[in-house]
Every structure is written in structure tokens, then in C-alpha cells.
Design a protein with these regions (language model features):
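Short, strongly hydrophobic alpha-helical membrane anchors
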Residues: 8, 12-45
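Low-acidity, Ser/Thr- and Arg-rich intrinsically disordered low-complexity segments
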Residues: 4-6
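Hydrophobic packing and interface segments
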Residues: 31-847
Length: 847
């Protein structure tokens, strides 16, 4: 193993002695050049660390099991509560089972494609070396492993969604019972811990899958991890698309008929779509978001190993590969500590408790990562980039809250616009959504600039010590100031961020121009690793929202006491804000992960064609065509999704109106047929999955083989830029309209039942498919296209020209895309009532 490189970047002058320090703390002895199962010169110390990471993944899953037992032991409330809860549980489980059956055929076909892809393009040199130069053996083993990894990735994504959603459903009735019996703190504990199960499943399975593949395949793992990442990403796309259409079709249909036309309250039991609405919260916000963040978690592992191997080839250091896995392990531990601490804060504000716990997790991760980078790698720059990622996630909290919280002046301005009708509400929300996209973009740009600065500029040595001392003094001042004002936690974290900034400046160092691109891309990947280091916290905060919402709905349907209803309303309000915040984090992480994959795309091409330059020349008309096509696809995808929601919502509205014509249902004397609306929503969501999935998978294939690799690079750039801006716009505009409506419902500007309230409901209805369907679905769509491009890029380079086979394949891909667009953009010629009858008849005959 080459001697470790030492640099004057605020690092250890003798990293070997740092290693020995860790060894004395319990690590195994250092052995140079040890040949092992990884087929790399990896030391025993690093082997032990990797297996510890695997053990941490097991701890996360064990913690999820402990939380599950805690939730299941809680009281489920009275018979009336359990009756309504049973409808929600059965509907959610039936939906996910139907969805998995729908996508199973496509998953099976793509598993075969993953297997065959290795035989079309030879494995990487690292994979051949791993199998001692036996290319035939390498092809066969990698082909089998990639196909199995694809199945494992999609299965893990489905498990996170299914089991996480199931525990959210189990938790919601128990939250309602706790609000009736135990009060605010008990209800908060059960709601958050129910969501934490999903967070720990995401952490544990993501870390387990990536680490296991690395342990088995070592330097050949990127060839296999492509399948793992693609499987998780594709399943997440289906979960987002299907769950998003389901939840918003039911929500829009229930609101427009129930609130606007019939003047009903939220979750009125006379509304036939109320159970479908509550089911939708689980399949969309629980299962969909969990799978979404899980695949971002996977993708950053894939990128870090691909780019880490590239840097290891440059200077022989293995910490480029191992350190991201160790940071992930630290993140899991910090998430366990932080999520457990939520129930320990004695505050009557759920948001405050969750934010404090997030800060605790952030502090543990940052301090531990700096210690790891200093003692293990001897490079503080690695820790500062992870800290930038953590800071990026933390920054999205106030940024998204400013755009979407009911406490924000921006949102209250939208509420005030209800005095002038729905059009004014829509215009205010559009303005806020567009502006917030720019704010979010600049935050992401700033974080990416950090990766550029760290490896592009040399901080003068004579200023390093003074800057460190100034940072330390300012940090101490902030801590003391916080202690004097009884805000020690806030003071500590303010001081910590000041010190991080000082260390960031100190760690800046210039790398050789020839390798700078690879270093910067790895830095971007570390930012993504840092941003998702608290995946457990993020998913817990997001799942807390639908759990509280469902508990509130069960309380309304069951006629619970006003005190309990108020507790659940307060939790629901906090959940709306945390859901919006985690959407921002999910979008930001999707962009960072996509940029990392973008860099891996060029590295992948260079393995096949070493002369390929890592430049996308926009002056080339063909490349510009690729850019335009890529930029248009998020718009196409969003348009088709919104139309699908509207089409399904019309069916729900027709069904609710039909049932309300029954005087007994309208008076409350008879229970509506809730199952009918659930069935319509399920059927409507499933028929959209395959067409939209085909567009995401086939578009980069068609562009790559028709316009070649440079245009494919432009295509990806267009998808990332357009998708990020559009996703933030839709998420924040929709969230702002939602909370503007809730602000009116709290008694401002006329309150419930007023004309102003009806105007706010219109705004909320417009925003629903934006924030919960189209916007979130763009996250996995961006990464599906990037991963498909990563897989086909070597094929595009290796098979130059336009043979008959390539032209036939491209024509077939384009034909399928056209079919998918026409299928999703279809017009229903029948009236909604007639469609309901037709769909019902089809489902009855199918049964």
C-alpha cells in the first residue's frame, strides 16, 4: 500500500500515529499491504470498521423492532375508534399489495435486463482484477450479482414503504387513544416513535445493502451497486407516482364536494371519500416518502464508492472508499440518539422538540466526523464537506418553513388574499412558489461551491492558526452567551457552526488540475452523504405528519372529546410543517445525488473511452438538443401526473355526490360505502404506473443511442436543472396554499364556512397534486434517468454509429414513449358519473 499522503491542511502531520491512537482504543492492528476478501490492500483496521458499520445497520433494525414492540403494546382505544381505524388499515394494505402486483412484471423484465447488461459491455477493469483477470467469470458473476442487487434494492424499497406504512397505520389509532387518555406528551411520543420505525428501516436497510455488497465484492462493488441503486430508485418512483395519485385524488374529491359544495367539516363521516383520503395519507406520505429518501440514501452510497475508487486509483488511499460508509454509520447512531430524545424534551410544541433533537443528531455527527477525518484520514476537508451537507439539510428547515408555515408572513399574505377571491389566492401562491425555487437553488449552489472551493484554493499557512483561534474564541463566546440567556443548546450549536466555518477555511487546499474534477465530484458526494446522514430524523419527521393527520381524522369520525381533538389538531398542525420541510430536504438531496451521479456518468464513459473529455459542449447543436429534451421531461411528467390526479378526482367527486343523494347518508343516519371510493382511487392510481415508469426508463436510452454520449450528458443536465426548480416550486406553492387554508380555518379572515374559507380551499385543492404528487415524483424520476444513463453510457460509447439493431431499438423505445404519453394524456369522453359506473362494473367482473 502506498505511503499516506500528508498535507498542510489543518490535518495530522503523522496520520500513522493517529491510526495507532485508534488502535489502542480497540481497533485491530495495522497491517500494510494485507490481501483480503475485498481484493484491495485494505488494512485490518479498515476491515473492522466496515464490519462495525454493518453491525450499526443491524442496531438500527433492532431499534426499529424495539420501537415496534413499544407501539404495539399501547392502547388502541375504544371499539368505535378501532372500527374506523380498521377501514384505514385494510384500505392501505390492499392498495400496496395491488401496487406491488402491478409493478412485479416490469421489475421481472428489468431484472433480466440487468443480467444481460453485463454481457453487452465488459465489466470494469477493477471487476476483472477482482476475478484475477478472468473476464468470462467476471461477466457471469457480476451479471448475476447485479440482477440480484436490483431485486434486493427494489425489495428493500418496498419493505421500507410497506412496513413503515403499516406501523404508521398501527400508530395513528394509538395516538388518538393517547390524546384521549394520556395528554399531549404521550400522544407526541407515540406519533413520533411510530414514524421513527420507518426512519430506522430506511437507515438500516440502506446501510446494510450497500455495506454488504462492498464487503462481498470490494473494488468490483460499483458494478453491482448500480443494480442496487436502480432497483430502489425505480420502486420509489412507482411508490411516489401511485401513492401521489391515490392520495390527492381522494383528497381533492373529498374537499371539493365535502367542504365547498356540502359545507362539511374536514373528515366528516358522511363524506364517502373520507376513508380514502386518510388511506391516501399513508400510501403517499408514509410509503412514498420513505421509499423516496431510501433511494437517495442508496444512490449516494453508489456514487461515493464509484468516485472513491477513482480517487483511490489516483493516490492509493482507501479512506476515499471507507470513510463515507463510516460517516453513514455515525449518522445512524446520531439518528437513534436524536429520535429517542424527542420524548425527553418537556415542551408543549412538537416542532420545537423535533428541531432540538435534529440539532442533537447534527452535533453528534459533525463532531464525530471531524474526529474520524482527523485521526483516520488526516484530512479535515472531508469532515468539512460532510458538515456542509448537514448544514444544507438544516438550512432547508427554516427556508421551507418560511415559505410554507402558517406562522410565516408569506403564507398569511395568501390567507389575506382570500378576501379577493380564489384567483388572488392562486396568484399569491404562484409568486411565492417561484421565488422559493430561487432561494432553494442558491442554497444548493452555495453548498456545491463549497466542494469547488475546498479543492481549488490554497488557504495561506500563516493564517491558519489565527483563523482557528478566532473561530474558537467566537464559539466560546456564543456558548457562554447562550448559557447566560438560558439557551445553552442554541448557543452551543451557534458556536459549533462558527467553528465549522473556520475549519472549512483552514482545510481549503489546491489539488492538481488534472485530478481536480474527480476531487470536486467526490466532495459533492460527501455533501450528499452529510445531508442524508440524519435520514432517520428526516423520515421520522415526515411520517409524523400523516400519523397525526390520521389520528385527527379518527378523532373526528369517532366523536372524541374536544380536549383530545385539540391535542390532535396541534400535532396535525406541527405535522403539516414537518412534512413540508422534509419534502425540501428530499428535493435537495435528490439534486445533490443527481449531481454525484452526473459525475459518475462521465467517469463511467472514461472507463470505456479514456480519451473522452469530461465536458458537455453546449455550443454543439446536438448537445443543446439533448439539453432541451431533458429540460422538457420534468414538465411532461408533471403535466401527466396532474392530469391523472384530476381525472381520478372527478371519479371520486362523482361517487361522493352519488352517495350524498341518499337522504339517510346526507343526514348521518346511514354509513356511506367507504370501500367504493377506496377501490376507485386504487384502480385509478395503478393504471398510471407503467406508462410513467416507461417514460422515465426509456427516455435516456433513446437519447443516448440516437444522439450519443455528449447529448446524453446535456440531457441529464436539463433534467436536473428543470426538475429541481419545478419540484421546489410545486412543493412550496402547494404547502403554502395548504397552510393558508388552515390559517383561515383557525378563525382568521372569516374562519370556517365563510366565502374566504371557500377561496382558500380552492387554493389548497390546486396545490394538493403539486405538493404531494407531481413535485415529490420528480425526485425519483431525476435519479431513475441518471442511473439508466449511467448503465447505458458504456454501451453508447462502445457501439458507435447506427447499426440496424440500434435503429430498431431506438424506434421501439420512442414508440413505447409515445404510447405511454398518449395513454397518460387520454381524454375521458364519458361524464364522470358514467365512468364511475363503468369502472365499478370492470372491477366487479375482474373479481
Amino acid at each position: 500500500m502506498p505511503k499516506r499522503r500528508t498535507t498542510a491542511i489543518g490535518a495530522c502531520t503523522d496520520p500513522t500515529s493517529s491510526r495507532l491512537l485508534l488502535v489502542t482504543l480497540g481497533a485491530a492492528a495495522r497491517q500494510e499491504g494485507y490481501r483480503n476478501m475485498f481484493q484491495m490492500d485494505i488494512e485490518v483496521f479498515e476491515q473492522v470498521m466496515v464490519f462495525i458499520v454493518l453491525a450499526i445497520a443491524g442496531v438500527a433494525l433492532g431499534y426499529a423492532l424495539w420501537l415496534r414492540n413499544f407501539i404495539m403494546s399501547a392502547d388502541k382505544g375504544n371499539a368505535e375508534m378501532q372500527r374506523h381505524w380498521g377501514h384505514i388499515r385494510d384500505g392501505a394494505n390492499a392498495y400496496l399489495r395491488t401496487q406491488l402486483k402491478t409493478v412485479a412484471v416490469l421489475i421481472a423484465l428489468l431484472t433480466v435486463a440487468m443480467f444481460l447488461s453485463v454481457f453487452v459491455v465488459k465489466p470494469t477493469p477493477e471487476a476483472n482484477e477482482y476475478f484475477d483477470g478472468n473476464e468470462d467469470k467476471a461477466r457471469l458473476v457480476i451479471a448475476i450479482a447485479r440482477a440480484l442487487a436490483f431485486v434486493m434494492g427494489s425489495s428493500f424499497s418496498a419493505m421500507v414503504g410497506f412496513f413503515g406504512m403499516n406501523m404508521a397505520v398501527q400508530g395513528n389509532v394509538r395516538v388518538a387513544a393517547a390524546a384521549e387518555r394520556g395528554g399531549y406528551q404521550e400522544a407526541l411520543k407515540i406519533a413520533y416513535r411510530s414514524g421513527t420505525i420507518t426512519g430506522m428501516l430506511t437507515d438500516g436497510l440502506g446501510l446494510f445493502g450497500g455495506t454488504t455488497i462492498f464487503i462481498i465484492f470490494g473494488k468490483a462493488s460499483p458494478d453491482v451497486l448500480l443494480g442496487f441503486g436502480f432497483g430502489g430508485t425505480l420502486l420509489a418512483l412507482f411508490m411516489r407516482v401511485g401513492g401521489g395519485i391515490y392520495t390527492k385524488a381522494a383528497d381533492v374529491g373529498a374537499d371539493l364536494v365535502g367542504k365547498v359544495e356540502a359545507g362539511m367539516e374536514e373528515d366528516d363521516p358522511r363524506n364517502a371519500a373520507v376513508v380514502a383520503d386518510l388511506v391516501g395519507d399513508n400510501v403517499g406520505d408514509c410509503a412514498g416518502m420513505a421509499a423516496d429518501i431510501f433511494e437517495s440514501y442508496e444512490v449516494t452510497i453508489v456514487s461515493s464508492l464509484i468516485l472513491g475508487l477513482a480517487l483511490t486509483a489516483i493516490n492509493g488511499e482507501l479512506y476515499w472508499i471507507v470513510l463515507p460508509l463510516l460517516v453513514r454509520g455515525i449518522g445512524v447512531v446520531s439518528s437513534i440518539v436524536g429520535t429517542y430524545a424527542v420524548s425527553l424534551w418537556r415542551v408543549d410544541d412538537a416542532e420545537e422538540a423535533m428541531y432540538k433533537s435534529y440539532e442533537v443528531s447534527s452535533g453528534i455527527t459533525i463532531l464525530s466526523t471531524f474526529l474520524l477525518a482527523w485521526l483516520y484520514a488526516g484530512q479535515l476537508s472531508l469532515a468539512t464537506l460532510v458538515a456542509v451537507g448537514v448544514a444544507l439539510a438544516v438550512t432547508f428547515n427554516p427556508l421551507t418553513s418560511y415559505a410554507t408555515s402558517a406562522k410565516s408572513k408569506r403564507v398569511q399574505t395568501i390567507s389575506a388574499a382570500t378576501r379577493f377571491g380564489p384567483a388572488s389566492v392562486i396568484l399569491e401562491g404562484l409568486s411565492l412558489g417561484y421565488l422559493s425555487s430561487v432561494w432553494a437553488l442558491f442554497v444548493i449552489v452555495t453548498s456545491l461551491a463549497a466542494a469547488i472551493l475546498v479543492y481549488s484554493y490554497e488557504f495561506p499557512n500563516e493564517y491558519k492558526l489565527p483563523v482557528a483561534l478566532i473561530g474558537l474564541v467566537l464559539a466560546v463566546i456564543m456558548i457562554v452567551r447562550g448559557r447566560m440567556r438560558n439557551h445553552l443548546v442554541e448557543g452551543f450549536f451557534a458556536g459549533m457552526w462558527i467553528m465549522v466555518f473556520a475549519l472549512f477555511l483552514i482545510s481549503m487546499h489546491q489539488v492538481p488540475d488534472v485530478h481536480r474534477y474527480s476531487y470536486i465530484l467526490f466532495g459533492v458526494t460527501l455533501i450528499g452523504v452529510g445531508m442524508l446522514s440524519h435520514t432517520g430524523n428526516n423520515v421520522s419527521m415526515d411520517t409524523f405528519g400523516p400519523i397525526s393527520d390520521n389520528a385527527n381524522g379518527i378523532g373526528e369520525l369517532s366523536g372524541m372529546s374536544p380536549k383530545a381533538r385539540q391535542i390532535m389538531a396541534d400535532l396535525d398542525a406541527a405535522g403539516n410543517t414537518t412534512k413540508a420541510i422534509t419534502k425540501g430536504v428530499a428535493i435537495g438531496s435528490a439534486v445533490i445525488a443527481a449531481v454525484s451521479l452526473f459525475g459518475s456518468f462521465f467517469s463511467d464513459i472514461q472507463r470505456v473511452n479514456p480519451d473522452f473529455e469530461k465536458i458537455v459542449n453546449l455550443a454543439d447543436p446536438v448537445v443543446f438538443v439533448g439539453l432541451l429534451i431533458g429540460g422538457s421531461l420534468p414538465l411532461l411528467f408533471s403535466g401527466l401526473l396532474i392530469k391523472a390526479v384530476n381525472r381520478a378526482a372527478n371519479l371520486i367527486m362523482a361517487e361522493v355526490r352519488r352517495q350524498l343523494r341518499d337522504p339517510e347518508i346526507a343526514s348521518g343516519a346511514k354509513t356511506p360505502d367507504y370501500a367504493q371510493a377506496v377501490t376507485i382511487s386504487t384502480h385509478s392510481a395503478q393504471i398510471e404506473l407503467v406508462p410513467l415508469g416507461l417514460i422515465a426508463v426509456l427516455a435516456p436510452i433513446a437519447v443516448g443511442f440516437l444522439l450519443k454520449e455528449q447529448a446524453l450528458g446535456g440531457f441529464l443536465a436539463g433534467v436536473i436543472l428543470s426538475g429541481q426548480l419545478l419540484a421546489v416550486f410545486m412543493a412550496n406553492a402547494g404547502g403554502a396554499w395548504d397552510n393558508a387554508k388552515k390559517y383561515v380555518e383557525d378563525g382568521y379572515f372569516g374562519g370556517k364556512g365563510s366565502e374566504n374559507h371557500k377561496a382558500s380551499v380552492v387554493g389548497d385543492t390546486v396545490g394538493d397534486p403539486l405538493k404531494d404528487t407531481a413535485g415529490p415524483a420528480l425526485n425519483p424520476m431525476i435519479k431513475v434517468m441518471n442511473l439508466v444513463a449511467l448503465i447505458v453510457a458504456p454501451l453508447v460509447v462502445e457501439y458507435e454509429g447506427y447499426s440496424a439493431g440500434i435503429l430498431i431499438g431506438v424506434a421501439l423505445a420512442i414508440a413505447l414513449i409515445v404510447w405511454a404519453v398518449r395513454r397518460s394524456d387520454r381524454e375521458d369522453t364519458l361524464a364522470a358519473e358514467e365512468v364511475v359506473e363503468r369502472v365499478t362494473a370492470e372491477m366487479v367482473s375482474a373479481d
